[in-house]
């Protein structure tokens, strides 16, 4: 969570490169307003990133794994219940003694991964991101240009509809 310009509690702010980060975030709201759903969405995202490579494979195994693969849609809206669920995070990584900002996300539906991307903030332009990889099931696009060339063939061979690139 990025810090604002409010100067109260400056001793709690952590500086990573050009970013000022708060070490704690809070979610509050009325009963049944969705606080637990935010936590469940993060848990699902972590689980999918760590385990999606196990969702592919044998057809019989896919049937049992598919129940874990599918996120719970927002059911109070007819358009949303059939739409893909999208998960996206921004994070800061330590890259050779320089803190770099990354953007990672993916969209999934009941057929698997619809879209996946990983971007890195360009060194020269604050706030502008450069693609490390991008894939889109609908268009068939698979751009691995930000990854080492020697890994392209292995990734293309190993990649299944249900698996995320970061899980391989």
Describe the predicted segments one by one.
Residues 1-44:
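Pre-Walker A-like glycine/lysine-rich segment at the N-terminus of P-loop NTPase domains
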Residues 5, 78-80, 137:
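Solvent-exposed, flexible loop/coil residues
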Residues 7-9, 95-97, 114:
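Residue-level signal for secondary-structure boundary sites
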Residues 14, 53-58, 133, 162:
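Short, charged/polar low-complexity linear motifs in solvent-exposed/disordered segments
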Residues 15-18, 28-33, 57-59, 121-124, ...:
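Short C-terminal domain-edge/linker segments immediately following a structured domain
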Residues 20, 26, 40-103, 110:
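Conserved P-loop NTP-binding catalytic core
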Residues 36, 47, 114-115:
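Short catalytic/ligand-binding loop motif for oxyanion handling, primarily in non-cytosolic enzymes
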Residues 98-168:
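Electropositive, glycine-dotted interaction segments
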């Amino acid at each position: 969570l990025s810090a604002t310009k409010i100067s109260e509690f400056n001793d709690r702010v952590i500086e990573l490169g050009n970013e000022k980060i708060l070490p704690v975030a809070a979610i509050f709201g009325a009963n049944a307003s969705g606080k637990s759903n935010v936590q469940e969405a993060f848990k699902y995202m972590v689980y999918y990133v760590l385990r999606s490579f196990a969702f592919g494979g044998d057809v019989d195994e896919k049937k049992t794994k598919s129940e874990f693969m599918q996120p719970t849609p927002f059911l109070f809206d007819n358009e949303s219940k059939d739409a893909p669920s999208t998960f996206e995070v921004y994070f800061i990584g330590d890259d050779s003694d320089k803190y770099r900002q990354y953007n990672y996300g993916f969209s999934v539906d009941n057929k698997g991964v619809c879209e996946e991307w990983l971007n890195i903030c360009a060194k020269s332009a604050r706030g502008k991101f450069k693609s490390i990889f991008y894939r889109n099931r609908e268009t068939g696009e698979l751009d691995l240009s930000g990854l080492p060339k020697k890994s392209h063939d292995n990734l293309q061979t190993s990649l299944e509809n249900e698996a995320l690139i970061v899980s391989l």
